[in-house]
C-alpha cells in the first residue's frame, strides 16, 4: 500500500497548474475559481426514495435510491428517512449520480461506513466523481467488512482534479499560492477520507489516469481487484472480491 504522504506530494505535483504556459501575448489568464473533482452544475438536492433491491444475497435489507446531483444537505435528508427505521435494520443505498459536491460525497461515504450501510451501483446512469467517493464507504452491517456492490453493467467513474481558469481575470503570486494550497487541501481531504474508511490508496491512480475533463470508468476486472463486489447481470451471481483475491494470491 502506498504511503499517504507520498501520494499527497505526488497528487499536489500532478494537479499543480503550469502557470508559465498560461502567459501569452502579454495577457495574463485569470486563475481558478475552484479546485475540485468534477462537479455537476445543477441546483437542488438528490431525490431519495425507498426502492426494491434487485440484487440477491441481501435478505431483510431496506433499500433507498439516491438519485441526482450530490448536493449539500443530502446526508441530512438521507438520515431523516433512515431514522424512521429500527436501528438494527440492514440498509442499502443505490447510488445514481453524475457527481457534485465533493465535501458532501465524502460526508455520505463516512456515514455509510459508520452506520454500516451497503452501497450499490445498478445499471443505468451510474455513479461518478463525488458519488463514487461516497460509494466507497459502503460496509456490511452483518460482517463489518466493506460491502460495495457494482452491477456488471453499472458505470462507476472517477475523475482527476480540474483547475478552472477565468480568462477575464489577472492572477498574482498570491493567487497562484492559494491555488496550490487549495489543491493540497483537496488531496489531504481525500487521503484522510481513505484512511477514515480503512481503504488503501488503490483508487487514487484511477483518478490520476482520468483525463481532466472526462470520467474514467472502472472496468469490472479492476473493480473486483480493488475489493468491490460485482453482480454479474448475465449469471445473476454476486462475485466476492476477497475469494477471487485469495485464489489469485494462491497461484
Give, region by region, the residue ranges found by the protein language model.
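Terminal peptide-recognition signature
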Residues: 93, 135, 223
Amino acid at each position: 500500500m502506498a504511503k499517504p504522504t507520498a501520494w499527497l506530494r505526488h497528487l499536489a505535483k500532478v494537479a499543480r497548474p503550469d502557470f508559465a504556459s498560461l502567459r501569452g501575448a502579454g495577457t495574463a489568464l485569470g486563475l481558478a475559481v475552484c479546485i475540485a473533482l468534477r462537479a455537476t452544475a445543477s441546483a437542488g438536492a438528490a431525490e431519495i426514495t425507498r426502492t426494491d433491491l434487485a440484487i440477491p444475497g441481501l435478505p431483510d435489507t431496506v433499500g433507498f435510491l439516491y438519485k441526482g446531483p450530490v448536493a449539500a444537505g443530502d446526508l441530512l435528508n438521507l438520515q431523516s428517512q433512515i431514522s424512521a427505521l429500527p436501528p438494527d435494520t440492514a440498509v442499502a443505498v443505490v447510488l445514481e449520480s453524475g457527481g457534485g459536491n465533493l465535501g458532501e460525497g465524502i460526508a455520505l461515504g463516512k456515514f455509510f461506513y459508520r452506520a454500516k450501510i451497503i452501497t450499490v451501483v445498478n445499471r443505468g446512469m451510474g455513479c461518478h466523481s463525488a458519488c463514487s467517493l461516497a460509494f466507497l464507504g459502503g460496509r456490511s452491517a452483518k460482517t463489518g467488512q466493506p460491502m460495495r456492490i457494482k452491477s456488471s453493467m453499472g458505470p462507476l467513474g472517477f475523475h482527476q482534479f480540474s483547475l478552472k481558469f477565468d480568462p477575464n481575470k489577472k492572477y498574482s503570486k498570491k493567487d497562484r499560492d492559494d491555488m496550490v494550497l487549495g489543491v493540497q487541501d483537496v488531496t489531504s481531504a481525500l487521503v484522510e477520507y481513505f484512511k477514515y474508511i480503512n481503504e488503501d490508496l488503490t483508487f487514487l491512480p484511477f483518478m490520476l489516469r482520468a483525463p481532466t475533463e472526462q470520467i474514467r470508468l472502472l472496468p469490472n476486472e479492476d473493480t473486483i481487484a480493488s475489493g468491490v463486489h460485482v453482480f454479474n447481470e448475465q449469471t445473476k451471481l454476486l462475485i466476492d472480491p476477497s475469494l477471487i483475491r485469495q485464489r489469485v494470491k494462491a497461484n
